[in-house]
């Protein structure tokens, strides 16, 4: 492999690659989406060179295929990211991310009076983008929050 084509992070045989993550968001994605709880090997690159972003983060998860729904939840933090499905070291599918209609079980509602804090229910937020601002509305208390406030509370 020539120096120009050398990978910055080791290739995987089977699994998922989350690419084009804005620098600094990789750790947040690993924590919020509980990716580090898998028993599979995860390879992470932080602040890698990127022509489009300047710097980017990259996450490779072996033997795990992220679904389109799971991939789209990442759009809250990395709207321009792609999720590549890898088989035998080759990309067999690419997910271009879109904001999901809803997201469940990932965040806690910031409203301390929300019933979701005291009942055994998964969090559920309806996701909307209005004038370039992503807002998440809790199903239970019906309060809306920007995604950065919701993620800070987790």
UniProtKB/Swiss-Prot annotation:
What Gene Ontology biological process does one annotation of this record name? pyrimidine nucleotide biosynthetic process
- The source's superkingdom equals Bacteria
Q: Which organism is it from?
A: Aeromonas salmonicida (strain A449)
What keywords sit in the KW lines? Answer: Metal-binding, Pyrimidine biosynthesis, Zinc
The record's annotation in PANTHER family points to: ASPARTATE CARBAMOYLTRANSFERASE REGULATORY CHAIN
Q: Which cysteines are joined by disulfide bonds?
A: none
NCBIfam families, from UniProt?
A: ATCase_reg
From the Swiss-Prot or TrEMBL record, give the protein name. Aspartate carbamoyltransferase regulatory chain
Return the InterPro entries for the record: Asp_carbamoyltransf_reg_N, Asp_carbamoylTrfase_reg, Asp_carbamoyltrfase_reg_C, Asp_carbatrfase_reg_C_sf, Asp_carbatrfase_reg_N_sf
Binding positions for Zn(2+)?
Answer: 109, 114, 138, 141
- Function summary: Involved in allosteric regulation of aspartate carbamoyltransferase.
Q: Name one Pfam family in it.
A: PyrI
Q: Lyase as a keyword?
A: no
What's the subunit arrangement here?
Contains catalytic and regulatory chains.
